[in-house]
A protein has these predicted regions:
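Short strand-connecting beta-turns/loops that link adjacent beta-strands
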Residues: 25, 56-58, 85, 110-114
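Generic structural detector for well-ordered beta-strands
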Residues: 19-23, 50, 81, 106-108, ...
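Hydrophobic pocket/interface hotspot
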Residues: 28-33, 39, 63, 80, ...
Length: 154
Protein backbone atom coordinates (compact mmCIF):
# COMPACT_ATOMS: atom_id res chain seq x y z
CA UNK A 1 0.00 0.00 0.00
CA UNK A 2 1.34 3.42 -0.94
CA UNK A 3 -0.04 6.90 -0.88
CA UNK A 4 1.47 9.96 -2.49
CA UNK A 5 0.99 13.70 -2.35
CA UNK A 6 2.69 16.49 -4.28
CA UNK A 7 2.02 20.15 -3.73
CA UNK A 8 3.53 23.55 -4.42
CA UNK A 9 4.20 25.95 -1.63
CA UNK A 10 3.64 29.65 -2.34
CA UNK A 11 7.01 29.45 -4.05
CA UNK A 12 9.29 26.61 -4.94
CA UNK A 13 10.49 24.07 -3.91
CA UNK A 14 8.09 21.34 -4.92
CA UNK A 15 7.41 19.03 -2.01
CA UNK A 16 6.38 15.46 -2.61
CA UNK A 17 5.51 12.99 0.12
CA UNK A 18 4.83 9.29 0.01
CA UNK A 19 4.18 6.53 2.51
CA UNK A 20 4.51 2.82 1.94
CA UNK A 21 4.73 -0.41 3.86
CA UNK A 22 8.01 -2.31 3.81
CA UNK A 23 8.54 -6.03 4.42
CA UNK A 24 11.35 -5.49 6.95
CA UNK A 25 11.43 -4.12 10.47
CA UNK A 26 11.65 -0.38 11.00
CA UNK A 27 15.14 -0.77 12.50
CA UNK A 28 16.44 -2.66 9.46
CA UNK A 29 14.89 -0.18 7.02
CA UNK A 30 16.33 2.76 8.99
CA UNK A 31 19.85 1.29 9.05
CA UNK A 32 19.83 0.47 5.33
CA UNK A 33 18.53 3.93 4.40
CA UNK A 34 20.92 5.69 6.81
CA UNK A 35 23.89 4.18 4.97
CA UNK A 36 23.97 7.12 2.54
CA UNK A 37 27.17 6.05 0.81
CA UNK A 38 25.30 2.95 -0.46
CA UNK A 39 22.60 5.04 -2.17
CA UNK A 40 24.05 4.42 -5.68
CA UNK A 41 23.38 0.69 -5.19
CA UNK A 42 19.62 1.23 -5.07
CA UNK A 43 18.90 4.62 -6.66
CA UNK A 44 19.74 4.56 -10.40
CA UNK A 45 19.80 8.36 -10.63
CA UNK A 46 22.83 8.51 -8.31
CA UNK A 47 26.14 7.48 -9.87
CA UNK A 48 28.43 7.91 -6.87
CA UNK A 49 28.53 8.91 -3.22
CA UNK A 50 31.54 9.89 -1.14
CA UNK A 51 31.63 10.59 2.58
CA UNK A 52 33.11 14.04 3.17
CA UNK A 53 32.58 14.34 6.96
CA UNK A 54 31.33 12.12 9.77
CA UNK A 55 29.41 12.68 12.99
CA UNK A 56 31.10 11.57 16.22
CA UNK A 57 29.12 8.31 16.13
CA UNK A 58 30.67 7.47 12.74
CA UNK A 59 27.61 8.10 10.58
CA UNK A 60 28.15 10.33 7.53
CA UNK A 61 27.38 13.99 8.24
CA UNK A 62 28.16 15.28 4.75
CA UNK A 63 28.05 13.18 1.60
CA UNK A 64 29.03 14.28 -1.90
CA UNK A 65 26.93 12.81 -4.71
CA UNK A 66 27.11 12.74 -8.49
CA UNK A 67 23.78 12.21 -10.24
CA UNK A 68 23.25 11.49 -13.90
CA UNK A 69 20.91 13.70 -15.84
CA UNK A 70 19.64 13.59 -19.42
CA UNK A 71 22.72 15.24 -20.89
CA UNK A 72 25.41 15.08 -18.28
CA UNK A 73 25.68 14.94 -14.54
CA UNK A 74 25.44 17.17 -11.50
CA UNK A 75 27.46 17.06 -8.29
CA UNK A 76 26.04 18.15 -4.96
CA UNK A 77 26.56 17.65 -1.23
CA UNK A 78 23.99 16.83 1.42
CA UNK A 79 24.25 17.29 5.18
CA UNK A 80 22.65 14.40 7.09
CA UNK A 81 21.08 14.24 10.56
CA UNK A 82 19.98 11.05 12.27
CA UNK A 83 17.51 10.37 15.07
CA UNK A 84 17.92 6.69 15.96
CA UNK A 85 15.18 6.83 18.62
CA UNK A 86 12.61 8.18 16.14
CA UNK A 87 14.17 6.14 13.28
CA UNK A 88 14.39 9.28 11.18
CA UNK A 89 16.99 10.50 8.68
CA UNK A 90 16.94 14.08 7.38
CA UNK A 91 19.10 15.72 4.73
CA UNK A 92 19.62 19.16 3.26
CA UNK A 93 22.03 20.59 0.75
CA UNK A 94 24.29 23.51 1.55
CA UNK A 95 22.57 26.89 1.69
CA UNK A 96 25.12 28.20 -0.81
CA UNK A 97 23.98 25.64 -3.40
CA UNK A 98 22.24 26.74 -6.59
CA UNK A 99 19.41 24.27 -5.99
CA UNK A 100 17.25 23.23 -3.08
CA UNK A 101 17.28 19.57 -2.15
CA UNK A 102 16.13 18.38 1.26
CA UNK A 103 13.98 15.71 2.79
CA UNK A 104 13.19 13.21 5.48
CA UNK A 105 12.73 9.46 5.77
CA UNK A 106 10.95 8.13 8.86
CA UNK A 107 10.35 4.47 9.69
CA UNK A 108 7.51 3.31 11.95
CA UNK A 109 7.35 -0.12 13.55
CA UNK A 110 4.41 -2.28 12.48
CA UNK A 111 5.75 -5.74 13.38
CA UNK A 112 9.02 -7.66 13.45
CA UNK A 113 8.71 -8.09 9.67
CA UNK A 114 6.93 -4.93 8.60
CA UNK A 115 7.28 -1.17 8.85
CA UNK A 116 5.81 2.01 7.46
CA UNK A 117 8.11 4.38 5.57
CA UNK A 118 7.18 8.07 5.44
CA UNK A 119 9.28 9.94 2.88
CA UNK A 120 9.34 13.63 1.99
CA UNK A 121 11.44 15.29 -0.71
CA UNK A 122 11.80 19.01 -1.45
CA UNK A 123 13.35 20.01 -4.79
CA UNK A 124 13.27 23.29 -6.67
CA UNK A 125 14.26 22.01 -10.12
CA UNK A 126 13.08 19.19 -12.35
CA UNK A 127 15.48 16.26 -12.24
CA UNK A 128 15.56 15.37 -15.92
CA UNK A 129 14.33 12.04 -17.16
CA UNK A 130 13.54 10.82 -13.64
CA UNK A 131 11.09 13.66 -13.17
CA UNK A 132 9.36 12.77 -16.43
CA UNK A 133 9.24 9.05 -15.62
CA UNK A 134 7.74 9.72 -12.21
CA UNK A 135 5.14 12.20 -13.51
CA UNK A 136 6.75 14.88 -11.35
CA UNK A 137 6.45 12.78 -8.19
CA UNK A 138 10.07 11.98 -7.52
CA UNK A 139 9.44 10.80 -3.95
CA UNK A 140 7.33 7.90 -5.23
CA UNK A 141 10.10 6.83 -7.61
CA UNK A 142 12.74 6.98 -4.87
CA UNK A 143 10.62 4.95 -2.44
CA UNK A 144 9.84 2.34 -5.10
CA UNK A 145 13.57 1.89 -5.76
CA UNK A 146 14.31 1.64 -2.02
CA UNK A 147 11.55 -0.93 -1.47
CA UNK A 148 12.90 -3.04 -4.36
CA UNK A 149 16.43 -2.79 -2.90
CA UNK A 150 15.15 -4.07 0.46
CA UNK A 151 13.35 -6.92 -1.28
CA UNK A 152 16.61 -8.00 -2.97
CA UNK A 153 18.71 -7.43 0.15
CA UNK A 154 16.55 -9.08 2.78
Amino acid sequence: MSSALAYLHESLPLTSEVSTTLSVSANVAYEVFADAVETPRWLPLVQSAKIMNRHQDGRPSRVGFTAKLDRGSVSYSLDYSYDPKALCVTWRNLTSSSMILSGEARFIHLSSRASLMLYRLDVDQPIGQWDEQSDGHLASAVVAEFREHLRRLC
